[in-house]
């Protein structure tokens, strides 16, 4: 560590994309957006891109009056591997000591403001305790998702065994940092039927792909198209906050897309992909050519096929308008939710204080049974029953009855008749890939798009990501899986963008998801399909527990409530490549009464 602060010397920023020798003849995008035969020099070496070609106008170095400086502790106050929040007057900073070095970072996760001091420090990064996002402690950069922004990194100096931090006042208050991005310099942008990168689907995967391309220096045309009428938004929040408005859910403001030349096509439905001519056809007849294509169409919710299926006031929730209409119709009235998965249970929880009655219909014996197991499912079911939710289990809807075309009753196969003014369906989804059936792009028997570790389809130059894909899950021996989670879509979108630029990145992240019901958060990491045992530490009745899901001798997933940061800890261990054995958990259960999880740092087997 240096003994004083100094203004950094100007540097020439260069972005270099180098293909391996064997790959240099292939047509990959360079950071300029051109195909490699044009974007690379004749001798096969990479072109260098200078800062002035791609960066926004740099901010001036903060003047002394714009900064705050404070001595926060003695070097011996923190052990290696410890974190502490320290106050600088204008805001707090996360101070980290790792391998004898001190690092100062923003103290809140930019995703939803979790205090990172309560997270997990491991392998040179800190993992958020709430949703699992990871940040490099040396740079502040976002390394694993969810979220879009990174942390600010502040200057640290050591003098006479004292640790002093210097930080910009503005950075302390913002608590998030958007990475430097290229701007579009293509003369044809917005005025041509051709594009370098076309992204079909503007969810998490599509947006992260576009942003990653710009972060990596790609300065040619990017077009992002969506069926929605809105700019990209946090769809995962719809079922948790039915009153949320589009502007509240927006992931980026419209000025962001304008500033970085990411063109948006809203209410744009793709009907055909012509891979031979690298062309996409839209429903209105508009056509766009592409050099690289990302397919991130997401999924379509399943609907009922019973008698009366077309009556009014029966909803699937895909847009803010859907959510808002459900809330409006449910206020003071009778709501029925079909399906006790995450979406259905989140909607039911939200409506308990708004509707006159809330009923849940489910084919299984308990909510979440296949995902969380019988015991955890029953504990959560009891929480809902204590909040006035009525369950009708091991049955399904046989008829929807209407009066003057509007829903009045839901009839179950058990012959039970439920009064209903509004019905929400949460019975699963199917990949929205019908437009690809005649394209030559591979689909499996269920309609998913199979991709490899680099998010490549069977067609060169065509990538896929998000809810509509199956991919090899690295830490489960490359088992082909579909994981329709918000965090996973982020990660896949980044890998797709990196491989459009020939960076040979591979998808390698531990699935992480969460939900919130009645003010309580459930967190989950791993991939637990096929678990054969559940080991529970804590108190299910008090909803303070951690559940380890095992298959044979290995922990394959973990879930918790009021037990942070255990899920982030397990996720970090699994991400490191270390297996957690069932016997480790069993021994912990036998000998530990404290809830201490330090055993997870052991070497294991």
From Swiss-Prot:
Superkingdom of origin organism: Eukaryota
Keyword list, A-Z: 2Fe-2S, Apoptosis, Electron transport, FAD, Flavoprotein, Iron, Iron-sulfur, Metal-binding, Mitochondrion, Oxidoreductase, Transport
PROSITE patterns in alphabetical order: RIESKE
Annotated residues for binding of [2Fe-2S] cluster: 109, 111, 128, 131
Main location: mitochondrion
Rieske domain ranges (all copies): 70-165
GO molecular function (one): metal ion binding
Subcellular location: Mitochondrion
GO biological process: execution phase of apoptosis
Binding site for FAD: 201-205, 235, 240, 270, 467, 514
UniProt-listed InterPro entries: FAD-oxidoreductase/Apoptosis (IPR050446), FAD/NAD-bd_sf (IPR036188), FAD/NAD-binding_dom (IPR023753), FAD/NAD-linked_Rdtase_dimer_sf (IPR016156), Reductase_C (IPR028202), Rieske_2Fe-2S (IPR017941), Rieske_2Fe-2S_sf (IPR036922)
UniProt feature, compositional bias: Basic and acidic residues: 18-29
Entry EC number(s): 1.-.-.-
Classification via Gene3D superfamilies: 3.30.390.30, FAD/NAD(P)-binding domain, Rieske [2Fe-2S] iron-sulphur domain
Notes concerning its domains: The Rieske domain induces apoptosis.
Family per similarity comment: Belongs to the FAD-dependent oxidoreductase family.
Record function comment: Induces apoptosis through a caspase dependent pathway. Reduces mitochondrial membrane potential.
Protein name per Swiss-Prot or TrEMBL: Apoptosis-inducing factor 3
């Amino acid at each position: 560590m240096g003994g004083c602060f100094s203004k950094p010397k100007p540097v020439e920023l260069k972005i270099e994309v180098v293909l391996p020798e064997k790959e240099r003849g292939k047509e990959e995008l360079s950071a300029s957006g051109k195909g490699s035969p044009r974007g690379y020099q004749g001798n096969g070496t990479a072109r260098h891109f200078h800062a002035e070609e791609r960066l926004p106008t740099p901010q001036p170095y903060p003047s002394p009056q714009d900064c705050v400086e404070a001595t926060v502790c003695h070097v011996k106050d923190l052990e290696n591997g410890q974190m502490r929040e320290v106050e600088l007057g204008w805001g707090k900073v996360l101070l980290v000591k790792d391998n004898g070095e001190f690092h100062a970072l923003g103290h809140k996760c930019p995703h939803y403001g979790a205090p990172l001091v309560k997270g997990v420090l491991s392998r040179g990064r800190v993992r958020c305790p709430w949703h699992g996002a990871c940040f490099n402690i040396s740079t502040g950069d976002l390394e694993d998702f969810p979220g879009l922004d990174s942390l600010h990194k502040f200057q640290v100096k050591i003098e006479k065994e004292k640790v002093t931090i210097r930080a910009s006042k503005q950075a302390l208050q913002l608590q998030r940092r958007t990475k430097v991005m290229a701007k579009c310099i293509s003369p044809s942008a917005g005025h041509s039927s051709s594009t370098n990168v076309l992204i079909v689907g503007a969810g998490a995967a599509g947006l992260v792909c576009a942003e990653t391309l710009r972060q990596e220096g790609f300065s040619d045309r990017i077009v992002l198209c969506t069926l929605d009428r809105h700019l990209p938004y946090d769809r995962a929040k719809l079922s948790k906050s039915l009153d949320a408005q589009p502007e509240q859910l927006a992931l980026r403001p419209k000025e962001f897309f304008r500033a970085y030349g990411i063109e948006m096509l809203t209410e744009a439905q793709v009907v055909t992909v012509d891979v031979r001519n690298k062309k996409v056809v839209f429903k209105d007849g508009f056509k766009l050519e592409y050099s690289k294509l990302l397919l991130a169409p997401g999924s379509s919710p399943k609907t009922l096929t019973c008698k009366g299926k077309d009556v009014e006031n029966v909803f699937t929730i895909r847009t803010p308008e859907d959510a808002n209409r459900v809330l409006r119709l449910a206020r003071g009235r009778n709501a029925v939710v079909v399906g006790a998965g995450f979406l259905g249970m989140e909607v039911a929880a939200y409506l308990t204080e708004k509707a006159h009655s809330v009923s849940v219909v489910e084919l299984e014996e308990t909510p979440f049974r296949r995902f969380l197991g019988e015991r955890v499912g029953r504990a959560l079911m009891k929480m809902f029953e204590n909040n006035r939710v009525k369950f009708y289990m091991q049955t399904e809807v046989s008829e929807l009855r209407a009066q003057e075309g509007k829903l009045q009753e839901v009839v179950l196969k058990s012959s039970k008749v439920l009064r209903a003014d509004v019905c929400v369906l949460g019975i699963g989804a199917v990949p929205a890939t019908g437009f690809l059936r005649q394209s030559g792009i591979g689909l499996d028997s269920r309609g998913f798009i199979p991709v490899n570790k680099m998010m490549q389809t069977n067609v060169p130059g065509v990538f896929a990501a998000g809810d509509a894909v199956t991919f090899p899950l690295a830490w489960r021996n490359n088992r082909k899986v579909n994981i329709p989670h918000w965090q996973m879509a982020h990660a896949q979108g980044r890998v797709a963008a990196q491989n459009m630029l020939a960076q040979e990145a591979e998808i390698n992240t531990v699935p992480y998801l969460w939900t919130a019901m009645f003010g309580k958060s459930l967190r989950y990491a791993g991939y637990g399909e096929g678990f054969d045992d559940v080991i529970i530490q804590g108190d299910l009745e008090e909803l303070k527990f951690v559940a380890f899901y095992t298959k044979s001798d290995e922990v394959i997933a973990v879930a918790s409530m009021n037990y942070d940061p255990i899920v982030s800890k397990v996720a970090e261990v699994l991400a490191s490549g270390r297996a957690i054995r069932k016997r480790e958990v069993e021994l912990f259960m036998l000998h530990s009464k404290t809830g201490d999880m330090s055993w997870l740092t052991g070497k294991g087997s």
